[in-house]
Amino acid sequence: AIDFAMYYAESARQLDVARSKFTPFKVVLVTPPWNFPVAIPMGGVFAALAAGAAVIIKPAPQVVQCAEVAIKAVHKALKGAGVDPALVQLVNADEAEAGKHLVSHKDVDSVILTGASDTARLFRSWKPKMVLNAETSGKNAIIVTPSADPDLAVADVYKSAFGHAGQKCSAASLVILVG
């Protein structure tokens, strides 16, 4: 999460250098998954804040307490920097109850979703013209070429496929052997 904060802070500085007209979204909704309960949600929060938007975060129900602790730290940092902590709000409500209302709300300009492709399609059906940044279900491949070190390739494939119990969005699910 700290790496995300540093990355997006530096990215925000570069917006000034670009000499382009930049109009931030007013409100960004962050809807993260359960499997990385701090890093992924905070990445979305920091990206939206760095771009000048207010943030609503609706964490996965399995990890609300993690999100609450992280958001308290964000509020403390914002206050220390002289920024209103109210720019970041956490919603703790049933997904079925809150999801459609939040996504389709007239003041929400954009949604950052890390989750299933079906969820992205559902969000799009609720608000077709919104900006949806969706990192969704994927099949990730590792390509092993003839010049690869075989022992290192096996170790990396094993780590990618089975590290984090296969619950990482970038976990390898396909190995392509070339040559």
Regions found by a protein language model. Give the residues of each.
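Long amphipathic alpha-helix in the N-terminal Rossmann-like dinucleotide-binding domain
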Residues: A1-L15
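Conserved small-residue-rich beta-alpha loop and adjacent elements
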Residues: Q14-A81, M130, D151
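A structured beta-alpha segment of the ubiquitous adenosine-cofactor-binding alpha/beta core
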Residues: A18, Q89-I112
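Generic hydrophobic/aromatic pocket-lining and core-packing "Φ" positions
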Residues: V45-F46, G99, A120
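Short, surface-exposed connector motifs at secondary-structure boundaries
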Residues: A51-I56, G82-P85, V103-S110
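Residue-level signal for inorganic ion chemistry
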Residues: G52, V88, V111, G138, ...
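General beta-strand structural signal in soluble alpha/beta enzymes
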Residues: I57, L90-N92, L113-G115, L132-E135
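ALDH superfamily catalytic-core signature
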Residues: A73-G82, K106, A116-G179
